[in-house]
Every structure is written in structure tokens, then in C-alpha cells.
UniProtKB/Swiss-Prot annotation:
This is 2-succinyl-5-enolpyruvyl-6-hydroxy-3-cyclohexene-1-carboxylate synthase. Pathway: Quinol/quinone metabolism; 1,4-dihydroxy-2-naphthoate biosynthesis; 1,4-dihydroxy-2-naphthoate from chorismate: step 2/7; Quinol/quinone metabolism; menaquinone biosynthesis. Disulfide bonds: none annotated. HAMAP family: MenD. The gene is menD. Homodimer. Pfam families: TPP_enzyme_C, TPP_enzyme_M_2, TPP_enzyme_N.
Amino acid sequence: MSTSVFNRRWAALLLEALTRHGVRHICIAPGSRSTPLTLAAAANPSLVCHTHFDERGLGHLALGLAKASTEPVAVIVTSGTAVANLYPALIEAGLTGERLILLTADRPPELIDCGANQAIRQQGLFASHPTLSVNLPRPTPDISARWLVSTLDSAMAQLQHGALHINCPFAEPLYGGDEQQYADWSASLGDWWQDCHPWLRQTCYPPSLYQPLAQQADWFFWRQKRGVVIAGRMGAEEGRQLTAWAAMLGWPLIGDVLSQTGQPLPCADLWLAHPRAQETLAQAQIVLQFGSSLTSKRLLQWQTACQPQEYWLVDSAPGRLDPANHRGRRIICPVGEWLSRHPAQRRTPWATELAAYSESAQAQVIETLAGQFSEAAVAHQLAELLPDNGQLFVGNSLIIRLIDALGQLPAGYPVYSNRGASGIDGLLSTAAGVQRATAKPTLAIVGDLSALYDLNALALLRQSSAPMVLLVINNNGGQIFSLLPTPEAERQRFYCMPQDVNFEHAAVMFSLGYARPNSWPQLREHVHQCWLRGGTTLIEVQVPPSQGAETLQQLVQQVTLIPQVAP
């Protein structure tokens, strides 16, 4: 028996089965134990192979590919700590819904817990975070090809949200052997190899709790009431649909930076602090929230405190998604589908004064930031930097809060982020995956600590298939902690942790373009030139450390003093 050859037969069938469920992209890290999987991936013409030397970044690369393609994406890593490095991306996928298939090569059972090199207990390593887990046996011809392909088909049919962990033990040898051996084992599947469908076509009907197909019977009653719409994270087309739907109802729409609604009432994080705006919103009889992962502090505070007669939350992801635990309805359904089943009725807007508060807040922002070249000013004017027919990736921490509070992105413009666990790890890798999946011009904006955290992902950005700009806002540390009541004496050393770096040499190391503009006109011109010439350019904007946080706090205070608007 040639173990190496049968390992490869087994792996080839495994990967072919995954392609029948829509897997096109596969991300591969170097390793010996994963050789059967790697060689099978390289030989499969249906797969696009991506490589990276850092498994943590590799997992986030796959996450970005899955976000932008909305398809399942596979990952191959070797045994040992390489597997554990996938944990952050797996956690994020579980919270935001991207489908990742983690193929983790493993030592065979007899090499576990006996001191063998690079052998750890991989089964169950990820605890409850994967949606599904499959622990495959050591490959052997005694196990039929039908069993393997049926097992994979069943798991993939159940995977609607989050990650699937497939642990794959392989015994040595891993190389060499007569490639013609065990052809009969593969051939036992007959003409399936020439087909394009799964071997086992399993249909999974969701439980009744998740079955939103019937229209809410009392919708025709509630659509005549005073309603408020909250828009969280959703797709571009859903954002456009929701904006038109809410406008027809005459209901105010408070849109998150990730809602892609165009934020018809911009600067909500500011004007929601105004007492009169809160009084107006308190008159709402029903609140409908579409999507989750809200960014704005003031919106979250209002969302927690509001007490409408009904609170409905619509999102395709499972789970409650409401930290405030409102009494109401949790409808697990795609936003677009729900809107089409619940038509709007044209009604006169009931909260017109909110538009006045929004306009006043926006005017205050423009006046305060006039002539500045600052973190807040870049966030406010970010829409001017976006490429035509492109996309935006927004990092976490302070920058996304500033864009949400001070900016206004175009309706339907694709925006991506990692706002499930909201970590700063893997952001550059995720942005690289988003760009590769779509081949669109991409603007990614992150802070300096986020860039440092994932610095070796600059290697992934060398391979952009369309112009890409990585905008690093260097405020010298984690200045989001300047927004929090952290102890002032310990703030810099233990929270902000300034690193006093610039990124010019990092860009040179990875053969990227680099610029460090000193004014808004320079920044705008640099970015415009990047869209024309292609490749990836790292543009660093150095700003005073705490200015962005201080500006946001100042604007919140100023907006609360806006004169009352007559209803």
C-alpha cells in the first residue's frame, strides 16, 4: 500500500466535493503535513489558489474573500499551532456569517500525546465557535469514496452561516509513489467525476423559528403608525432598497456607516445627543432594526433606552443580535426578501425636525473642520476619495467611529469591515481578500496600530488586480482610549501605547508605493493618481495623537446646544 498516493486520492476527492458546493477560492499556507491537500488544490482547475506564509493572516484573507464573493472559501494549513492561528478569523466568521471551510492537516492518532513533533490535540480545538466540525479518519482504502463524499456533502448542505472545521489526519509518507495506484477507489463514483453536482443533494429546511416566509399578519396595521428605522450592517442593494422603503413610509432612517443606505440623516452620532431629537424619537410606536453591529455610541444608547410598543429586528443571521433585549420580534430573514414581502405605503413624514437637527449638526462639522487636515477631517470628507465603481474597507477602533459620526457615504456604495468581534487583528489581510474577490479599485482605511498588527499582510497587497490604496491614519497609538474614562496617568503607557513609527520603510520592504501628504489637496491628488496608475499605494496621514477623539467630543457638546427646532 502506498500511503502517500492514497492520501492524495483522498484529498483530491475531498476538494472536488467542496467545489460542488460553490468553493472557488482556497487559501494555502506552507507545510508538510498538509501536502496531500495542497497538491490536490493545485491540481484542481476549479480552484483559485491564494498563498500566505502567516496562518493568522491567511484566515483573514479567506474571510475577506468570503465577504466580498458571498461564497464559501476554503483554507489549508498544516498541523500544530498553524491551526490555532485561524481562531480569530473563525470567530469573526461565526459572528458575521461568512462561510469558511478550515481544512486542518493533522498527525494520525498514534502520534498525539506522545511527544511527537508538531502534534497537538486539534479535535475540538475551536470549541463552540465553528458552526460545524467534521473529524475525518486516517485515509484508508477500506473506507469507501461514497462515505467520504457523502459526509462532506451533508456538512456543506448544513453550512448556512459561519465556519466548518474539517480535521484531516494524514500518515507518512506524504511524498512520492505510483500515481496510478488506487484509481479504482476514485472510479467507484462513476460518472460523478464528469458531473458538476454534489453526490448527496441534501436539503435542509430551517426550523419554524427561522421560517419568515409568511408576511407579518399585522404589518398593514403597523405601517400606519409612527415608526423609526435603524439600519445596521447590510449589503449594497439592501441598503438602497431600505432607503426607498423608509422614505415612502415617511419614517426617519438612522443609518450606520456599514448600512450602505447613504445615511439620509447624517451625523446621527452627534444629533442623537440633542435632548429634543431624543424627545421626538420617543414618540415612535414601532422601531424596525435591519442588520446588526451598530457603530454609533449615541445610537446604541438610544436603541437601548427606547420603549416603543413594538421592536422588530430583521437579519438573515441567526441569534438574538439585540444586546438591549427588547420585547418584540426577531425575524431571521434576508433584508431584501423581508422588504419585498412587507410593502410600504406612502405617508407624510412624521418627524421632519430630525432632518433639521441633522443639517445643523452637519453644518457644525463643516464649520469646525474648515481648513483642518486632521483625522476628523479625513473621516468627514472620505467620500471624495472613493474610486468610481470601487469599494471601501473600514478598519476598527477610532476611525470607523469618526466616519460614522462625521461622514456620509454614497447610497449603495460597497463597504466592508470586521465588525463582528471588532478586533484590529487581520484587517489588512481581510482587505486584501475583499479586493481579490471582486477585482475592484479598493480604498482601505485603518489606524497605525491596526497596520502594525497585520504588517506582514502588506505582502498580500503586492498582488492587487486593480488599484488599491491603503490609507493609514497615524495618530501614534490606540487613541480610541482617549474617548474613554481611562486613568490619565496610565493612559499613554497602558492603553494608547504610542509606537513612534512611520510606514515608509514598510512600504519599501514590500515594494508598494508610498506617500505622506501634508494637506487635504495633496491627499486628494495622491489618491486620484493612484486610481489612474494602478498597483497598491500606502498613504500615511500623520495627525496629532488625541485630536480626533477630542474633536468628536467637542462636536457632540456643540450639537447639544443647537436651538430647538419647531415640529
